[in-house]
Amino acid sequence: FSYLYHEYIPVLGDGYSTGQGMLYTWGSAELRCYRLANTLARGLVPTVYMEQVSLESSDEWVRTVSQAFLSYCRPYPRFREYLLEGITRRPPKVDCAEQDLWHWQADEQGEKLADGRRARKVTIRRPTVVAGSFEAEDGSLGTIIVNATAQPQRATVRLARRGRAAALFRADRSEEQRWDRPPSQIGVSLEAFGVRMLIVR
C-alpha cells in the first residue's frame, strides 16, 4: 500500500499518513523520527504539526524531531526526479541495527494521560536505517537511505539491480563514492539523521 500511496495520494493529514487515525498521541521522539524517516523513504510529502518543529526550543522532544525533519527535507529539491517524479520500485534489503520505540495505545485500564484518555505504553522494535527506491524517467534507479536515529549508524545495502555504474551522494548531492562496476552490496556510514542517495544506471 505504501508504494501505491506514493503514486496516487500526494498528501494527507499527518496522523493518517502514519497510521495513527483520530486517536493520535505523540509517543517517543524516536518514534516520531522513525515515522519521518519512513515518509522520506516512501517519497511522501513531509508534514508535521507546527508545535512539533522549531528552530529554537527548550523542549528536548521538539529539538530532536526538528533536527530530523529539517535533515529529511534536504533531499527533495536535489533528487526530485526520483523522490517527487519517480516511479516507486521495490527497495533493496538493508542490514542494520534495530531500536526499541514506544507509543501509547488506548486502554481503559491504562495510565491516565494529560488529556484524560487512558492508555498503556507499548514498545516496538524497528530498524535504525530505512530505504526506498524510485525509477527516474531516464531509467536510472535512485535509492534513498535514511538514518532514523540521532546516533551515527552503519548499514549494508544489498543491491537487487547492479547496473553498469553506481554513485553514492550526500543529501546536498555532493558525491561520496562511485563504482564503475557496482558490487552486490554496499556499506554506508550515516551521521545522525543522515541521508544518502544511491543512484544506479
Language-model segment annotations:
Residues 1-164, 171-172:
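Active-site-proximal substrate-binding groove within the catalytic cores of carbohydrate-active enzymes
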Residues 151-153, 175-177, 196:
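Short, surface-exposed beta-strand/loop "edge" segments at domain boundaries and coil↔beta transitions
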Residues 161-165, 186-189:
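Short, low-complexity, polar/charged sequence segments that are solvent-exposed and flexible
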Residues 167-184:
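Solvent-exposed beta-strand/loop surfaces of large extracellular or lumenal domains
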Residues 181-201:
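C-terminal beta-strand-rich structural cap/linker in extracellular carbohydrate-active enzymes
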